[in-house]
């Protein structure tokens, strides 16, 4: 059964915020397979990730920044000094393959490459049940077409 937790922090220190999010998000998870992090642009992102990794170890971290706020089960979280939120997923049954790439010259080919790499990390050629992608605006559709070339219709 899929297990997940959501956490957040408004600590002023980037490292402390990342660590606090991770500590709360991994509670009762058997093995953290992936963590999604969304944070304020006010944080030093490298320090935030260092804090999170100090708890998560080698679990992949995916995410991006927000200039305004994040939404968690408790409501909208925002702070002038910074904010971060994390969704951690981990259980015995879930397999997660994470891959990334620089933009490249051909977004569709980049999408294919990333899809193949993520599937290889899981050790399967079976299409995933879920695909999550973060890309700069403008070429997302071409990345998705490349992913679909490999996995079929993107779930």
Where do the PLM segments sit?
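Cofactor- and metal-binding active-site motifs of prokaryotic enzymes
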Residues: 1-155
């Amino acid at each position: 059964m899929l297990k997940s937790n959501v956490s957040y922090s408004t600590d002023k220190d980037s490292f402390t915020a990342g660590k606090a999010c991770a500590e709360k998000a991994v509670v009762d998870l058997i093995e953290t397979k992936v963590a999604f992090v969304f944070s304020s642009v006010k944080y030093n992102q490298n320090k935030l990730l260092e804090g999170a990794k100090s708890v998560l170890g080698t679990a992949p971290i995916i995410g991006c920044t927000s200039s305004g706020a994040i939404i968690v089960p408790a409501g909208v979280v925002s702070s002038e000094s910074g904010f971060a939120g994390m969704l951690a997923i981990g259980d015995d049954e879930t397999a997660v393959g994470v891959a990334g790439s620089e933009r490249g010259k051909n977004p569709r080919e980049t999408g294919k490459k990333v899809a193949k790499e993520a599937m290889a990390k899981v050790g399967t050629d079976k299409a995933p049940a879920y695909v999550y992608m973060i890309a700069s605006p403008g070429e997302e559709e071409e990345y998705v077409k490349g992913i679909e070339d490999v996995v079929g219709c993107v779930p």
